[in-house]
Amino acid sequence: TELLNETESYWGYSNTAYSIGIIISGLIAFRLSEKFLAAKWESILFPLVAMAIVTLTILYFPNAQMFLVFSALVGMLSQLKEVPESVFLQETVEENNLVNVYSVLEVISTLAFSVFVLLMSYITENFGISISFWLSAICLMIEAILIYIRRDYFR
């Protein structure tokens, strides 16, 4: 709200833009499913790098309308990353263990999300929004590097 000079209600628009991005990328993934299957690690790597770039770009264009566009882009990219991740899990985990794996992943994901929201709130409050965005971009790039290093595992 400080960076964009918007009210708290603006974040509802931002969340809506993010959700629209998810819906659009779902349609894209449906249309390009064969390409995702043929290039799993690339289909995970590209959205990670692109999300890091978009995250940093937001800092240099602190404009409320552009932020909505960037929110939609991040929604699209996050969904495009999740589709090949899900396919990878389904192909590598035995069918009778799939429910357990998804359950554990959901618990870990929810717990990690909660902890990182708290941590990033603290960092933003004490060090500023720019540091939070930079940390987010760095984390995305670390994940991208790990995917690249382990790319043979995805074949």
PLM regions: where:
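C-terminal transmembrane bundle of multi-pass solute transporters/carriers
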Residues: 1-155
